[in-house]
Swiss-Prot record:
The keyword Phosphoprotein does not apply. It comes from Gluconobacter oxydans (strain 621H). Pfam families: Ribosomal_L14. Belongs to the universal ribosomal protein uL14 family. CDD domains: Ribosomal_uL14 (cd00337). InterPro entries: Ribosomal_uL14, Ribosomal_uL14_bac-type, Ribosomal_uL14_CS, Ribosomal_uL14_sf. Binds to 23S rRNA. Forms part of two intersubunit bridges in the 70S ribosome. This is Large ribosomal subunit protein uL14. PROSITE patterns: RIBOSOMAL_L14. GO terms for cellular component: cytosolic large ribosomal subunit. PANTHER family: 50S/60S RIBOSOMAL PROTEIN L14/L23, LARGE RIBOSOMAL SUBUNIT PROTEIN UL14M.
Amino acid sequence: MIHPETNLDVADNSGARRVQCIKVLGGSKRKTASVGDVIVVSVKEAIPRGKVKKGDVHQAVIVRTSYPVRRADGSAIRFDKNAAVLLNKQQEPIGTRIFGPVVRELRARKFMKIISLAPEVL
């Protein structure tokens, strides 16, 4: 459950380390986002010589949440921290590597590039 002003870790090598959600996309009344949802983020912390810099505004897809994700079989999966992958205008990842596991729900949302780059899909 990601709300506006929630801080997230970045799970790729785009150069950003921490981002803050500034808008949940998908309708004017939408207040929260979960795994697989696209949000608008502002880069709060970045490494030198990265592809993005502090203050940049990008779209991102949520790949891990600390709030449990319920599945159809009754199981739930949760992570220690919230994490996102930054996207460009064509909804493709900015980075070329993904760090840490991602959830299977991304496959249904057509984020195949992220699924293929991830070291583990849970």
